[in-house]
């Protein structure tokens, strides 16, 4: 049994990869699923569609790999984080659509928590800013709006979970209601110092403890799949939120190492070791992973709109036919000619945390063309990352020596060069871009003893290309100053 199955449940698609012990992909499958926007600021997924696409991908990947489920050493799961589900324990049926991490419907509830003076208490316990991004206020909203939900929750009839919990519940035939420490740390309900659910915060939001999953290590066997799902009972031995899994897959095992994932959003995580670093610059202190009871912490900066900006150029503006076309279009001009795009379509994440910022486009002239807007879009992705690195540096977690990158948009050579230029440090792209799924596989493999430890895993990591900064310092500083001026104008655009 030398194969691993990685289930990668993302924001826009479900993926599954079968990997061998060398981290080589033997079979893969991917399916997209529908995004639902029932009201402005709302983003939902169909929980049943999440399951259907993920499990179908798992079976297809095994078939393409020519690997029977009985030959799997373990299953690892990685998932879109913070997305919130509520279901019946008796049937496993979801009571409402999944509220996606991008959803802003609880922004006003977060305002009330801040106005009541709870922000410092929440930050001290969870390491998080009070924001609609996280699960806590989403869950409270479901309990308030699904008829009878709070009473049923108190009676122990309902279960809450992020996507990992939802998948494990159904993989195990309802036998397991668990989440890993990293996913738990994204709920705004988990004390990251004591590594347990915070009773004070549960009481504050009137969330019955009976709803909550058991918190387990990110690496280690927590149970098995039921044979009906995959065709055999397979140990479930790895669970990690997508960004934690990507950090693990990038072998960022030493304090000070960092990776940025360019997906729907962009997520920069820096390993801070066995001790949490409290940010004074509105970054998130989070749990990277927990193995054998030992916790590794990280600083995180979350960008809400990353690759989604390229999708908007394609679907919203019609400037490109395919997402890959943005590189050639942006490369057709030497710079953006002063055009600045602030992609605050759903507000701004770290380090601003402004739910009322909105997307803005500055510096347009009669000479502005599609190529300038495309280039400004790539620059916006890179400049948001610059803001995060600067905040980490101020928090004492830097200076950054190099940035490891992954995610779909990391394949864009122009974006990676722009990123290196604006950061002023090398950007390193690995040979294996599927680092999120790889991280899930690594966590699972470690959990069943496939590797001796993280040192052996680190030796597997290989760079594909290194992008060195070539931009002059004065041009870099001018671009960053122009960007920050634009961000200030975009902030607070809509009324609270």
Swiss-Prot record:
It holds the Pfam family FGGY_C. It comes from the Bacteria. One of its GO terms (molecular function) is ATP binding. Its EC number is 2.7.1.30. Keywords: ATP-binding, Glycerol metabolism, Kinase, Nucleotide-binding, Transferase. One of its GO terms (cellular component) is cytosol. Inhibited by fructose 1,6-bisphosphate (FBP). CDD domains: FGGY_EcGK_like. One of its GO terms (biological process) is glycerol metabolic process. Sn-glycerol 3-phosphate binds at residues 11, 81-82, 133, 242. SUPFAM superfamilies: Actin-like ATPase domain (SSF53067). This is Glycerol kinase. It comes from Aromatoleum aromaticum (strain DSM 19018 / LMG 30748 / EbN1) (Azoarcus sp. (strain EbN1)).
């Amino acid at each position: 049994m030398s194969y691993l199955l990685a289930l990668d449940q993302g924001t826009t698609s479900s993926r599954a990869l079968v990997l061998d012990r060398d981290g080589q992909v033997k079979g893969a499958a991917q399916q997209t699923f529908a995004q639902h926007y029932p009201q402005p600021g709302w983003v939902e997924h169909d929980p049943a569609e999440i399951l259907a696409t993920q499990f179908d991908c798992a079976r297809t990947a095994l078939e393409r790999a020519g690997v029977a489920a009985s030959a799997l050493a373990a299953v690892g799961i990685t998932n879109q984080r913070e997305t919130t589900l509520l279901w019946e324990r008796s049937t496993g049926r979801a009571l409402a659509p999944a509220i996606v991490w991008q959803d802003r419907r609880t922004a006003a509830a977060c305002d009330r928590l801040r106005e009541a003076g709870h922000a410092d208490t929440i930050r001290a316990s969870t390491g998080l800013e009070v924001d609609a991004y996280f699960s806590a206020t989403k869950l409270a909203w479901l309990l308030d709006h699904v008829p009878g939900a709070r009473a049923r929750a108190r009676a122990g009839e309902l279960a809450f979970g992020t996507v990992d919990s939802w998948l494990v519940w159904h993989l195990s035939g309802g036998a397991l209601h668990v989440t890993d420490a990293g996913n738990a740390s994204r709920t705004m309900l988990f004390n990251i110092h004591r590594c347990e659910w915070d009773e004070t915060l549960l009481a504050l939001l009137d969330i019955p403890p009976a709803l909550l999953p058991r918190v387990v290590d990110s690496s280690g066997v927590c149970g098995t799949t039921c044979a009906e799902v995959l065709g055999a009972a397979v140990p479930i031995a790895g669970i990690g939120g997508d960004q934690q899994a990507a950090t693990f897959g990038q072998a960022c095992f030493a304090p000070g190492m960092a990776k940025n994932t360019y997906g729907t959003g962009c997520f920069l995580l820096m390993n801070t070791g066995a001790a949490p670093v409290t940010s004074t610059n509105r970054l998130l202190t989070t749990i990277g992973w927990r193995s054998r009871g030992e916790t590794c912490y990280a600083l995180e900066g979350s960008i809400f709109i990353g690759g989604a900006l390229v999708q908007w150029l394609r679907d919203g503006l019609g400037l490109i036919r395919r997402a890959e076309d943005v590189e050639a279009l942006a490369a057709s001009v030497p710079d953006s000619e002063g055009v600045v795009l602030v992609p605050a379509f759903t507000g701004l994440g770290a380090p601003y945390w402004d739910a009322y910022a909105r997307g803005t486009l500055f510096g347009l002239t009669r000479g502005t063309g599609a190529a300038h807007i495309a280039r400004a879009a790539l620059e916006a992705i890179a400049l948001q990352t610059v803001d995060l690195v600067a905040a980490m540096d101020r928090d004492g977690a830097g200076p950054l020596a190099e940035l490891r990158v992954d995610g779909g948009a990391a394949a864009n050579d122009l974006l990676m060069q722009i990123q290196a230029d604006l950061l002023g440090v090398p950007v390193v792209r690995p040979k294996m871009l599927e680092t999120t799924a790889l991280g899930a596989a690594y966590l699972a493999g470690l959990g069943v003893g496939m590797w001796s430890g993280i040192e052996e895993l680190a030796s597997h990591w290989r760079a594909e290309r290194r992008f060195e900064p070539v931009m002059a310092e004065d041009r870099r500083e001018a671009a960053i100053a122009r960007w920050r001026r634009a961000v200030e104008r975009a902030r607070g655009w809509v009324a609270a």
